[in-house]
């Protein structure tokens, strides 16, 4: 099972680094920062499906 440590998020700004992750919502997030901010906004309901594009 893939996992990402989001303990240091949310962050006010994310870099444009492209390292895609696929969320449990079948949406591709550009990088860990974007994904983790979305996880925080979802109150933890969003999880990582896998690394790479959906």
UniProtKB/Swiss-Prot annotation:
Principal subcellular localization: secreted
User: InterPro entries annotated for this entry?
Assistant: Bifunctional_prot_inhibitor (IPR051597), Kazal_dom (IPR002350), Kazal_dom_sf (IPR036058), Prot_inh_Kazal-m (IPR001239)
Keyword match Ribonucleoprotein: no
Q: Name one GO cellular component term.
A: extracellular region
Alphabetically ordered keywords of this record: Disulfide bond, Glycoprotein, Protease inhibitor, Repeat, Secreted, Serine protease inhibitor
Pfam families noted in UniProt: Kazal_1 (PF00050)
Which sites does the entry annotate for glycosylation?
A: 43
Residue intervals of the Kazal-like domain: 4-54
Which residues are listed as membrane-spanning?
none
Superkingdom of source: Eukaryota
Name of the protein in its database record? Ovomucoid
Origin species, per record, is: Alectoris chukar (Chukar partridge)
